[in-house]
Design a protein with these regions (language model features):
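Sec-type signal peptide cleavage vicinity
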Residues: 1-39, 43, 58-59, 64, ...
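A structural detector for beta-sheet-dominated domains
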Residues: 12-16, 25, 70, 83-87, ...
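Tryptophan-paired
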Residues: 26-71, 223-276
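Structured domain cores in non-transmembrane regions
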Residues: 32-117, 129, 201-206, 210, ...
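Compositionally biased low-complexity segments at domain edges in trafficked proteins
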Residues: 92-203, 284-336
Length: 336
């Protein structure tokens, strides 16, 4: 009997900044199917939530990990041994999230996600959805580890925050790790040690508030097409038609960057962008309370927008608006 091919996924390993890079001694990703999977070769890279690099595809359904690593900036070895919540994993493995509101051959209304299993891959012409594609590990100071599930380029969801344990008896690990290094442990410590290293900033980014984004404008011809959220906790969310017109309230982290696309007529398509300070925006959400409304109010001339939190002005670090040309279903340019 021909063996069933296991679904593929990529693994990413990242750190908050280049000051907090780590190196691995050993690693194993456990799968529901029982086959082995592993981390990419080398140390962490990229930014919080995104490594910026790929590796050999892994196979199966990830359900846990056993990882031993070295944080040079703390001169400490850690072990992360964790089981992921199985019911949650099974649920998310069945989901395929919408990536684009473009003009695919599928004429059905989009949904945030459908239960399509593991083999959906986004295609601008044929398929709006993407199944689980990347398992992302983020390593912060003091053994803080966050794991995300990524679906294509548009959606990234935090699976959980975990705590690695300090390994005190580490001489054998030191021998193994530094055997082929050009520097020894003392030299790495002298170069990288940071007594102020703390996970607090990245723990703070995980704070959530119950709120909903709303896009409004006085132009009766306003059509909304897409809204992309990049949160400080590294999650990504995309809102498309039709639910962009009535985005549900749920617990969300503080936005780092948002962009949204609208039209008010033929050849009148615009994208607005806003960038936020975590400290200032978090203070505003603290005062706003639960079930808040984050409103983006487009000016009648489409050249700017204002931001309100529960009808009170909310200042962004910067905002931008410019014209664009993207194909969407229901566009005034009739791309269907």
């Amino acid at each position: 009997m021909k063996q069933k091919k296991l679904p593929e996924f990529q693994v990413e390993i990242c750190s908050p900044t280049n000051d907090y890079l780590i190196e691995f001694v050993s690693d194993k990703i456990f799968t529901l199917e029982g086959n082995g999977a592993s981390l990419p070769y080398g140390g962490t890279s990229g930014e919080w939530g995104y490594s910026g690099s790929g590796w050999t595809e892994q196979h199966g359904t990830p359900i846990g990990a056993d990882i031993t690593y070295y944080a040079g900036y703390e001169d400490t070895f850690y072990r992360l041994k964790v089981d992921f919540p199985l019911d949650k994993i099974k649920d998310y493995m069945e989901r395929a999230y919408a990536q684009s509101g473009g003009t695919t051959e599928d004429k059905a209304s989009l949904e945030e996600y459908k239960r399509l299993g593991r083999n959906e891959r986004f295609s601008a012409n044929y398929n709006s959805y993407n199944s689980f594609s990347n398992l992302v590990f983020g390593f912060a100071p003091k053994g803080m580890v966050v794991v995300w599930l990524r679906y294509g380029m548009g959606v990234r969801i935090e699976l959980g925050r975990y705590q690695a344990e300090v390994i005190k008896e580490d001489k054998e690990l030191e021998k193994k790790l530094f055997a082929n290094w050009s520097m020894n442990r003392q030299e790495v410590r002298a170069r990288d040690f940071n007594p102020e290293a703390s996970p607090q900033e990245w723990d703070n980014y995980r704070i959530r508030y119950a709120y909903k984004p709303v896009i409004t404008g006085e132009n009766k011809a306003l059509r909304l097409f897409e809204m992309n959220y990049h949160y400080y906790n590294a999650e990504l969310e995309i809102m498309l038609r039709p639910w962009i017109n009535n985005i549900p309230i749920k617990k969300r982290a503080i936005p780092k960057e948002i962009s949204f696309v609208w039209e008010t007529g033929k050849d009148q398509q615009f994208v607005g962008r806003a960038y936020f300070s975590w400290e200032k925006t978090n203070e505003a959400f603290k005062k706003a309370g639960n079930n808040a409304k984050l409103e983006f109010k487009i000016a009648p001339d489409n050249n700017s927008f204002e931001i309100f939190l529960n009808d009170q002005p909310l200042k962004a670090d910067s905002t931008r608006v410019f014209k664009t040309e993207s194909e969407y279903k229901d566009s005034y340019n009739n791309y269907n």
